[in-house]
Amino acid sequence: MSKDVIEYSKLFAKLVNTNDDTKLDDTIASFLYYMFPRELFIRAISLLESSDMFIYILDRVHNKEGNEHTSLIDVLVDEFYKGSSNSLLEYRLIVKDTNDGAPPILVDIAHWFCSCEEFCKYFHEALEKTDEKEELHDVLINEVDDHLQFSDDRFAQLDPHSLSKQWYFKFDKICCSHLLAFSILLRSSINVLKFFTVNSNKVFVIAIDNIDEWLNLHINIVE
């Protein structure tokens, strides 16, 4: 089935069992398993349950006494699900690399980028297969300018705030478990976000209110 038919973000949104929000829905999970190659979905779920995923937020507002963790989740809900954030949220999606001494992995679902080896491998493969007359943009991005063809799917969507066009990265060409895991978390539903960050407490949301610490975070990624 094509990207035009399947709305992946709606499938991700159904991952949490409607009768028991402490469990995943096995039927939906089994269906999604077959939607992605190289056991990507299994690896993404394993990553979400690994305690190796972190969301760092440059925070000058919600870092107050009281229930700080809940307020940070509310910040993410406003940014990714309600679109009611009053200012541009500065955040970084980080995965701890399991290889000793390796730098953290930076994930950017807004621009469909990951610093991992798997992403780089498939990006270079796509680059090698690109004809000299072809633009890389045309090879990797699906542009939709017909409003009748617009989709509600948010998975692999670029610049979701545009009203005139829609752009989707062709994830069937380049995708990794890190991009898929964070997409499941942030491009699905509030229930799924809270399942992994609050209920199971496997994905950590951390506020940084000191600009020096924020810069050190980026230095550690580069190193």
Curated annotation (Swiss-Prot):
GO CC terms in record: nucleus
Annotated localization: Nucleus
Keyword field: DNA damage, DNA recombination, DNA repair, Nucleus
Keyword Transcription regulation attached: no
A single GO BP: DNA repair
Function, in words: Plays a role in a RAD51/RAD54-dependent homologous recombination repair (HRR) pathway to repair MMS-induced lesions during S-phase. Required for error-free repair of spontaneous and induced DNA lesions to protect the genome from mutation.
Oligomer and partners: Component of the SHU complex composed of at least CSM2, PSY3, SHU1 and SHU2.
Family of this protein: Belongs to the SHU2 family.
Protein name according to UniProt: Suppressor of hydroxyurea sensitivity protein 2
The organism of origin for this protein: Saccharomyces cerevisiae (strain YJM789) (Baker's yeast)
Gene behind the chain: SHU2
